């Protein structure tokens, strides 16, 4: 299944995602896979605030299902994905 759907992320994460794609010249789907693979810890939840403003982004249904399965903290998917994108942006 390679269908795309939309999900939400914070405005900051959206800007970080754009910067990562421009800096690395990697396609959107690759950057999303890298972000989803990032581990989010309890300290990340406390250390990195996520704004309430949201933007929609494209994601494959498989990637969204993976993200939901990795949501051990049972937090909002938008917050979880925003944290993962932020952690990836710290490495770029």
What name fits each language-model region?
Residues 20-49, 73-92:
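Short, basic amphipathic alpha-helical segments that act as recognition/interaction helices
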């Amino acid at each position: 299944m390679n269908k795309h759907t939309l999900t939400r992320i914070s405005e900051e994460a959206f800007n970080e995602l754009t910067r990562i794609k421009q800096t690395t010249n990697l396609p959107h789907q690759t950057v999303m896979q890298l972000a989803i693979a990032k581990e989010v810890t309890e300290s990340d939840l406390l250390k990195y605030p996520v704004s309430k403003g949201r933007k929609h982004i494209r994601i494959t249904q498989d990637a969204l299902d993976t993200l939901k399965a990795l949501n051990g903290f049972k937090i909002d998917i938008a917050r979880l994905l925003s944290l993962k994108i932020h952690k990836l942006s710290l490495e770029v």
